[in-house]
Amino acid sequence: MPTINQLVRNGRKRATKKTTTPALKGAPQKRGVCVRVYTTTPKKPNSALRKVARVRLTTGIEVTAYIPGIGHNLQEHSVVLVRGGRVKDLPGVRYHIVRGTLDTLGVSDRKQGRSKYGTKRPK
């Protein structure tokens, strides 16, 4: 416990919040190029084949990003937009690919929650 005099001299240090998305360098999104598109299995108790992509960002950093939604058109050399947001059951996946921008198509036949999957309004 510091004395009043010590607090007057130095004050309290503010606890700095550690960023969860260091590769974005403080930006909301970053553009990148897919290096490898593949599937992985989630950790216990879940079971699936989750679609992920290894993306080289414009900052030069390579990250693993999750491809949300059912079906996708991504392949090697696709240009994608990457946002923050981890996938809880995939260790090491701390980023999401934004659907409906750049080379990523929106999810087809989607009626609800369309904005999250880059789908246009059905006629």
Curated annotation (Swiss-Prot):
Q: Which domain of life is it from?
A: Bacteria
UniProt lists compositionally biased (Low complexity) regions at 18-27
Question: Where is the stretch described as Disordered?
Answer: 9-28
Alphabetically sorted, this entry's keywords are: Methylation, Ribonucleoprotein, Ribosomal protein, RNA-binding, rRNA-binding, tRNA-binding
A GO biological process held by the record: translation
According to its UniProt record, what is one Pfam family this protein matches?
Answer: Ribosom_S12_S23
Does the keyword field hold RNA-binding? Answer: yes
Query: Nuclease: is it a keyword of this entry?
Result: no
Q: Which residues carry this modification: 3-methylthioaspartic acid?
A: 89
Q: Which InterPro entries match?
A: NA-bd_OB-fold, Ribosomal_uS12, Ribosomal_uS12_bac
List the GO terms this entry assigns under cellular component, sorted alphabetically: small ribosomal subunit
Any one Gene Ontology MF annotation carried by this entry is: tRNA binding
Known role: With S4 and S5 plays an important role in translational accuracy.
NCBIfam families in the record, alphabetically?
Answer: rpsL_bact
Q: Fill in the subunit field for this protein.
A: Part of the 30S ribosomal subunit. Contacts proteins S8 and S17. May interact with IF1 in the 30S initiation complex.
Would you identify the family this protein belongs to, as annotated? Answer: Belongs to the universal ribosomal protein uS12 family.
* Family annotation (PANTHER family): 30S RIBOSOMAL PROTEIN S12 FAMILY MEMBER (PTHR11652)
Name of the molecule in the record: Small ribosomal subunit protein uS12
